[in-house]
Amino acid sequence: MPGPASGRLSVAWGSIGDVRPAPTILHLDMDAFFAAAEQAAKPSLRGKPVVVGGIGARGVVSTASYEARVFGVRSAMPTAQARRLCPNAAYLSPRFTLYRQVSEVVMELLHALSPLVEPLSLDEAFVDLEAGGVPAETAAVRAVGEQLRRDIRSATGLTGSVGLAGAKMLAKIASEAAKPNGLVVIEPGTERELLGPMTVRTLPGVGPATAETLRRAGIHTVAETAEAGEAELVRLLGKAHGAGLHAMARGQDDRPVVAERDAKSISVEDTFEVDLTDRTRVRSEVLRLADRCVQRLRAAGRSGRTVVIKVRNYDFSTLTRSETLRGPTDDPAVIREAAVRLLETVDTTGGVRLLGVGVSGLADFTQEDLFAQLATEREAEEAATAAAAEEAAGGTEQHEAEEERPRRWHPGLDVVHDEYGAGWVQGSGVGRVTVRFETPWSAPGRVRTFAVEDPALRPGEPLPLVGGAPAGGQSSEPAILPKFLSPEPGDTGSVGEEISRR
């Protein structure tokens, strides 16, 4: 991401509105969360490329470690393509039990800072520091951000990047600039100078297709986007998208940090690198988004009654469809099924550039009999098709179910052997399963191969990333991550200092 310009911008933006006078909105984004958790749990993978996601022929990458990203692997990429780019990476099925455990620790640290915490996913959240009584001064909020990073490292063994600004959009941009394992402060009053020279892709919701439309109109930077004016952007992109983009380019973002339990709806959406034209891929993405939405529902202790999908087509037209269930639910199968039914009512043949799945009508309980809402007439053949699509999406429920069927030894699965102790599945096939025996606090472990039905081998539970070593071991130390993800002694975020001074 480009840094701020050294001189003042020549374009006339007008005033930056809706930004607080102090950088009291914090955005935390854990670094390569799923992959980093796997590296912390598995000493033999530290410093090596790791890819977490669906591992089948139609699987999709959920998270790639920074070592894998060097080879071009990224989230939402088909796993088959990732294997071609980085054949020597460790490809692991997600372990959502572990990720939720770590997320709960991180969210507890955030709630200690403020009553207003807005989780966006298991590994990302906004925090209103002002509501937590932190003084509205740059030095004070910086100190809070740095202490948070240290606390996260101590409690989980992982790292997170922190952005601080006077508005949510700016705080998120700051945390992106801080990656990996850093802190960036955007001082109120410096927004125009900071944002102006950045590419339009910096702004939320601007994917390759939108950027190309703007490029053809001679608009390349945030400053040029603001200068173009709302009317021109509406002409190019449509009313909603054009007006919203113009406001963001001017730094206008008055959205409050909303505690998830106070939210009226919970939703997630993704803009794609290229328009999706394959119907199967569109369905897989909807399933993946439904899983993410369920994660947020459960993190907030909520359930919802109305399922909504959002589809933005190649021509920027945006459609929404909704279905109201008989009662509130947080069951992933119910929400996926409803989202797919809604998708079937939308024509996507021209190409899809954005998809979203949301749930509204929130409640504090789950109606247990909502499994009855699943379509019962689609039995064996339909179930097989859904299972294949869910594998492509790296779905939460599927992988949890796989963990409950121990004789299907998926890569990354926790196991325990009567003689060798705790370990994880490195691979399986032709009636054999290979296990590496190591723990988060051990040295890289040895490898053994067993028959898949070996009675001495059984599924295990995720081990704590910190504090779990035997007496006399390293129980007080976090797992040691690759050096580039570890802060140097005395490091207080020099990148943040540089940006906040400008």
Regions found by a protein language model. Give the residues of each.
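Intrinsically disordered, low-complexity mixed-charge segments
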Residues: 362-392, 459-472
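C-terminal accessory/binding modules appended to enzymatic or scaffolding proteins
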Residues: 386-435, 442, 447-449
